[in-house]
């Protein structure tokens, strides 16, 4: 642990903690300052001026990042309208019908997304307390409850990911890997920021985006210049 702390301390060298960097420069620094031996993620944290006790100020949805984020998303499809072979052909990792639902609690650590249609939702309702806190409960707002299950699987396997505000109005997301070209990560970040700006609730007063920072999986957080236009 001491060795890691020493590396992390060293990673802060050359970074002005009080300075906000242009987005490209901040991402480049985050890549250079990663201290993991593996190809870690580049993450973004966005602080929004939202009162999440108000339903209309709770942001949740999904976005297809233009360059993906490099993560292998493990998808479970629950449907009785398509075959296992059809689901597998578009990249689904697991597949089942109504009788498969009983297996879900045993495989929570093996799946990242559950995609289904409206007909299956009443059967999944009994697992709400298990799936909800883990962010696994299918939801039409993020495209995981849909009539076109196969298309949804393709999108999530290509890099479509969920975004949502936490209790304090923060959004945390992976927007790429350390090994990505910096411009590719910048494009992903801008796509997310533009989407969030377009979702600004009409009831928000004052500065909407209050803080932005990017960071590697292990390494320093770097402030980003905010453009609220």
From Swiss-Prot:
UniProt subunit comment: Part of the 50S ribosomal subunit.
Keyword Cytoplasm annotated: no
Recorded GO CC terms: large ribosomal subunit
Protein's recorded name: Large ribosomal subunit protein uL1
InterPro entries, alphabetized: Ribosom_uL1_bac-type, Ribosomal_uL1, Ribosomal_uL1-like, Ribosomal_uL1/biogenesis, Ribosomal_uL1_3-a/b-sand, Ribosomal_uL1_CS
Gene, per the UniProt record: rplA
Superkingdom to which the source organism belongs: Bacteria
Family affiliation: Belongs to the universal ribosomal protein uL1 family.
Keyword terms, alphabetized: Repressor, Ribonucleoprotein, Ribosomal protein, RNA-binding, rRNA-binding, Translation regulation, tRNA-binding
Source organism (scientific name): Ureaplasma parvum serovar 3 (strain ATCC 700970)
Biological role: Binds directly to 23S rRNA. The L1 stalk is quite mobile in the ribosome, and is involved in E site tRNA release.
């Amino acid at each position: 642990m001491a060795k890691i702390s020493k590396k992390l301390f060293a990673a802060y060298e050359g970074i002005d903690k009080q300075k906000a960097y242009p987005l490209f420069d901040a991402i480049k620094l985050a890549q250079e300052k990663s201290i993991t031996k593996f190809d870690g993620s580049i993450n973004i944290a966005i602080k929004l001026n939202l009162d999440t006790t108000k339903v209309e100020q709770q942001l949740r949805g999904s976005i297809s990042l233009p360059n993906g984020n490099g993560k292998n998303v493990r998808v479970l499809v629950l449907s009785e309208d398509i075959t296992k072979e059809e689901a597998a052909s578009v990249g689904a990792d697991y597949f089942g019908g109504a009788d498969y639902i009983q297996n879900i609690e045993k495989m929570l650590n093996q799946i990242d997304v559950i995609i289904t249609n409206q007909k299956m939702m009443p059967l999944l309702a009994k697992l709400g307390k298990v799936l909800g806190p883990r962010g696994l409960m299918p939801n039409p707002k993020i495209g995981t409850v849909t009539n076109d299950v196969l298309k949804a699987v393709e999108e999530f396997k290509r890099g479509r990911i969920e975004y949502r505000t936490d209790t304090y109005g923060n959004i945390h997301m992976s927007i790429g890997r350390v090994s990505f070209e910096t411009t590719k990560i910048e494009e992903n970040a801008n796509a997310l920021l533009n989407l969030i700006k377009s979702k600004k609730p009409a009831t928000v007063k004052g500065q909407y985006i209050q803080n932005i920072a990017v960071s590697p999986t292990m390494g320093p957080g770097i402030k980003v210049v905010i453009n609220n236009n």
